[in-house]
Amino acid sequence: MIRGAPAPMAEPPPVVFCHDSPKRVLVSVIRTTPATPPCSSVGEPEPPPPLVPTSPGFSDFMVYPWRWGENAHNVTLSPGAAGGVVSAGLPVAAELPTLRGAPQSSASVAAVSGGEDEEEASSPDSGHLKDGIRRGRPRADTVRDLINEGEHSSSRIRCNICNRVFPREKSLQAHKRTHTGERPYLCDYPDCGKAFVQSGQLKTHQRLHTGEKPFVCSENGCLSRFTHANRHCPKHPYARLKREEPTDALSKHQSPDNKAAAEWLAKYWEMREQRTPTLKGKLVQKADQEQQDPLEYLQSDEEDDEKSGAQRRLQEQRERLHGALALIELANLTGAPLRQ
């Protein structure tokens, strides 16, 4: 090797990996690439021309077209926007650089940030009902908008302190406790004494004393159980949790430390059995049906499978439709500069 100044080596092209696999590369929806300004005779660069959106490329979907349906529900078509922007709600794209070192535009970042809100709003843990009424605690950045909406709303279920409106009277009463600081639901477990604003919070807390874990991972063969519905299985983070009432062997394994705790647990399980007799009746009826007439029981299972299959096919058709609409929008975007 000859000593001297080392020859400059070209840097290898950057490779973007997603989930440790080069096959699933995500790029931003719209990439604005400013043209390199030529240097003037004086030596001062000319002002850069306005940013022109280039070809959207693969947008925020996976590279393979047949996987577009997996994220088609995150597509938002905006024909009224300037230039027509197609946004996709994938927060991963905000963390990844665009290909070929091009900087991300503010439009793509805004699309990603809006997608995060949409994803959180559509998640099962957000508490949306089938009729469109929102439940649960709202996001902190939306409280001001809710207050502004309440000032102009005609609803009578209104908070007299902050003017927020609510779909039901029970929600308003629970909300008012955030102003007064009242916590009427007290845990009566020995030496606990914690108080809560809502009764559901108390029930969730008491599972720590009873050892209940009614939410299980929906992955086949996984035995992970959880106390609350908003947890995620560490082995299967993308699997949903399903509620499964534990058997006596699983639910009553908690060994009390003293006599008072033992009495509290006995009283708790007695009240629990009194509250849920109908659920046990349904489980016993299903077991009896399986033992008495197994053919009829299997037939009912087949009917359930047909219903779930029909729902799955309908969902696939909707995803294909969203994918087709996204393709049409992308074609319009790429063809607009050519027509001009």
Swiss-Prot record:
The keyword Phosphoprotein applies. GO terms for biological process: regulation of transcription by RNA polymerase II. Expressed in bone marrow and ovary. GO terms for molecular function: DNA binding; DNA-binding transcription factor activity; zinc ion binding. PROSITE patterns: ZINC_FINGER_C2H2_1 (PS00028), ZINC_FINGER_C2H2_2 (PS50157). The keyword Ligase does not apply. It holds the Pfam family zf-C2H2. Its main location: nucleus. Residues 101-140, 280-317 are annotated as: Disordered. Residues 299-332 form a coiled coil. Residues 127-140, 307-317 have a biased composition (Basic and acidic residues). Keywords: Activator, Coiled coil, DNA-binding, Metal-binding, Nucleus, Phosphoprotein, Repeat, Transcription, Transcription regulation, Zinc, Zinc-finger. The modification Phosphoserine is found at residue 300. GO terms for cellular component: nucleoplasm; nucleus. It is found in: Nucleus. Belongs to the krueppel C2H2-type zinc-finger protein family. Transcriptional activator. Isoform 1 may be involved in transcriptional activation of erythroid genes. This is Zinc finger protein 367. The gene is Znf367.
